[in-house]
Amino acid sequence: MRIGVVCPYSFEVPGGVQAHVVDLARALRGMGHEVAVLAPADEHTPLPDFVQPAGRALAIPYNGSVARLSFGPVSYARVRRWIREHDFDVLHLHEPIAPSLSLLALMVAEGPIVATYHTSTTKSRALNAFQVVLQPFLEKITARIAVSALARRVQVEHLGGDAVQIPNGVDVRFFADAKPLDGYPREGPTIGFVGRFTEPRKGMPVLLAAMRQLLTDMPDLRLLVVGRGDADDLRREAGPELADRIDLLGQADDETKARALSSVDVYCAPNTGGESFGIILLEAMSAGTPVVASDLDAFRRVLDDGMAGVLHPVGNPIALAGALRGVLSDPERRATLAAEGSRRAAAFDWSVVAGQVLRVYETAIAADPRHVGEAL
């Protein structure tokens, strides 16, 4: 099968949707299919050989964060040329309503089109304003996928049409085989955090407040952080009690992230909202690391209602401290959580998820057997 995939977010900055697109493409290629990906990126961005850069993107506030998106006449022309140069059996668009390449491809293309919705954010004012304009293009979508029940609910309630729920995938073996970083595991307890630590919804202030309560019982406690943000701002926020206990790796490649997850005693996701899934939880679970996470609906579903990890009330540092203490002070509980987490993660392995996506492609092609081309 010849598959075209469009990612709306720039590959110049790592993100969950970008990782999903690349991992899905690799899994499908491993199954013998031809896959080409189009995404915002400049010519100097390191990319897999199956990803074609569509030019630099602009940083735009979107979905409670800042996304790097590509839109305008130059991007439109590049999308048209890409579709014209390939003879795809199916076109797979991620986040087709984001003002970027996926929406442009939806405007340009005709034929079997599959759309995946990642976000759980309800309809924005901008989408309300352009709903009438967008609706004819949304009706071109042949089949829809939502990565979570929350994303599916947004699709059904605000965009019309149902969606098949297929979760994000994870390369379980990649994380399971990762070796700890040099100097790890330590004698004292180490908490792990991955993400843009200066972004409020990622919950770093909640985690720092919880750590302050643990220092009396755990004087050797440290925090290993992987992600983007201002290191000086983080240390100032941590204060004199915690600043020297933070090991900051900065933005890291996948191998370093996997090794970091394998190095810590517990992975903490203190997020306060805006999450539709929680792929980082699965990555930590695949690495054999116990997870403590906010009791967000998306995280609860990934953690199997708390069977595969510990959930704590959102935004409550006292409760988070108690949850972390309960895991860090009990080796048997850590081992049990690690085993349950590994079991749960196996259900999300890309070998399973890619097969589910492929069946949606087959359904879309059966409904519209034309090859993908430019709309007249």
Identify the function of each model-found stretch:
Residues L234-A258:
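Nucleotide-activated donor-binding/catalytic signature segment of Leloir-type glycosyltransferases, i.e.
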Residues L150, G169:
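Carbohydrate-associated surface elements
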Residues G183-K202, L208-R212, L224:
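Conserved donor-binding/catalytic core segment of Leloir-type glycosyltransferases
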Residues C7-P14, V21-V22, R26-V74, R228-A231:
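N-terminal strand-loop element at the rim of the active site
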Residues V266, P290-A293:
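Short hydrophobic beta-strand element within catalytic cores of glycosyltransferases
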Residues A319, G326, R333-A347, L358-R359, ...:
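A short, well-ordered alpha-helix in the C-terminal region of glycosyltransferases
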Residues D305-G306, V310-P317, G326-E332:
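Conserved acidic donor-binding segment of nucleotide-sugar-dependent glycosyltransferases
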Residues A41-D42, V194, R222-R235, G250:
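Glycosyltransferase donor-sugar binding loop
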